[in-house]
Swiss-Prot record:
<keyword id="KW-0456">Lyase</keyword>
<comment type="subunit">
    <text>Heterodimer of HisH and HisF.</text>
</comment>
<dbReference type="GO" id="GO:0016829">
    <property type="term" value="F:lyase activity"/>
</dbReference>
<dbReference type="InterPro" id="IPR004651">
    <property type="entry name" value="HisF"/>
</dbReference>
<dbReference type="GO" id="GO:0000105">
    <property type="term" value="P:L-histidine biosynthetic process"/>
</dbReference>
<dbReference type="InterPro" id="IPR013785">
    <property type="entry name" value="Aldolase_TIM"/>
</dbReference>
<keyword id="KW-0963">Cytoplasm</keyword>
<dbReference type="InterPro" id="IPR050064">
    <property type="entry name" value="IGPS_HisA/HisF"/>
</dbReference>
<comment type="similarity">
    <text>Belongs to the HisA/HisF family.</text>
</comment>
<dbReference type="Pfam" id="PF00977">
    <property type="entry name" value="His_biosynth"/>
</dbReference>
<dbReference type="GO" id="GO:0000107">
    <property type="term" value="F:imidazoleglycerol-phosphate synthase activity"/>
</dbReference>
<feature type="active site">
    <location>
        <position position="131"/>
    </location>
</feature>
<dbReference type="GO" id="GO:0005737">
    <property type="term" value="C:cytoplasm"/>
</dbReference>
<feature type="active site">
    <location>
        <position position="12"/>
    </location>
</feature>
<keyword id="KW-0028">Amino-acid biosynthesis</keyword>
<comment type="function">
    <text>IGPS catalyzes the conversion of PRFAR and glutamine to IGP, AICAR and glutamate. The HisF subunit catalyzes the cyclization activity that produces IGP and AICAR from PRFAR using the ammonia provided by the HisH subunit.</text>
</comment>
<protein>
    <recommendedName>
        <fullName>Imidazole glycerol phosphate synthase subunit HisF</fullName>
        <ecNumber>4.3.2.10</ecNumber>
    </recommendedName>
</protein>
């Protein structure tokens, strides 16, 4: 059986509104989250992701009411992340109507939350999100990744909304997350995020090949072809995008019809 490839709109939330920036900066308003999620539901999105991008940084919990409102109107899986630090936080989000939770900063600080979450709620509920960036300094412990121009670097995990480097190698962290019970990896490259120049194929492929769980490629979509490249060259299981959907440059259906025409299995 051929697994269908998923198209996932991502809604970055700040103060209950959808925002979008470039390279994690310059945020601008993109609309009401429930309204946008409903639109993507109608267009045939496979899932929707809500990420409260300031929750971890500002030590603020996610707005439960917003999730309840969205979950009441959606008929597709909803993943929610941002500011989830404890099992109780995870349980609250799942009870509010989310199908999965995304753990990022908290998982780096306390990797045992991945294991505890998987044991309590099932591996299918636990998505480990990684914000990564290229690092060209010498690191014998890191997994080298060859870039398109032939140079080699390693990818560093960055936390707190992309503001704090950790020294952790992204490929090794992905494998550890899998071993600890993560059901999926949500991978965002800070180099390509919001640029519309395409996914960071080098790191997407490296992590897709290293991990035995689904990898969601994120950061950089600008054209229909970029989705195709994410699946073929990047070997991702799902592709996530934000601004191209939020501002009406293309619809989820446009993407899926294009991919189907190129031989990529999708649910239409």
């Amino acid at each position: 059986m051929v697994l269908t490839r998923r198209i996932i709109p991502c809604l970055d939330l700040k103060d209950g509104r959808v925002v979008k920036g470039t390279n994690f900066l310059g945020l601008r308003d993109a609309g009401d989250p429930v309204e946008l999620a409903g639109r993507y539901n109608e267009q045939g999105a496979d899932e929707v992701v809500f990420l409260d991008i300031t929750a971890s940084k500002e030590k603020r919990g996610i707005i439960i009411e917003l999730i309840q409102r969205a979950a009441d109107q959606l008929f597709l899986p909803l993943t929610v992340g941002g500011g989830l630090r404890t099992l109780d936080d995870i349980q609250q989000i799942l009870r509010a109507g989310a199908d999965k939770v995304s753990l990022n900063t908290s998982a780096v600080h306390d990797p045992s939350i991945i294991t505890k979450g998987a044991e309590s709620f099932g591996t299918q509920c636990i998505v480990v999100a990684m914000d990564v960036r290229r690092n060209f300094t010498l690191n014998p412990e890191a997994v080298p990744v060859r870039l398109c121009d032939g140079t080699t670097c390693w990818y560093e995990v960055v936390i707190y909304g992309g503001s704090k480097p950790t020294g952790i190698d992204a490929v090794r962290w992905a494998k550890e997350a899998e071993e600890r019970g993560a059901g999926e990896i949500l991978l965002t490259s800070m180099e390509t995020d919001g640029t519309k120049n395409g996914f960071d194929i080098a790191v997407t492929r490296a992590i897709s090949e290293a991990a035995n769980i689904p990898v969601i490629a994120s950061g950089g979509v600008g054209t229909l072809e970029h989705f195709y490249e994410g699946f073929t060259r990047g070997k991702a299981d799902a592709c996530l995008a934000a601004s191209v959907f939020h501002y009406g440059e293309m619809s989820v259906r446009d993407v899926k019809e294009y991919l189907k025409g190129k031989g990529i299995p999708v649910r239409l």
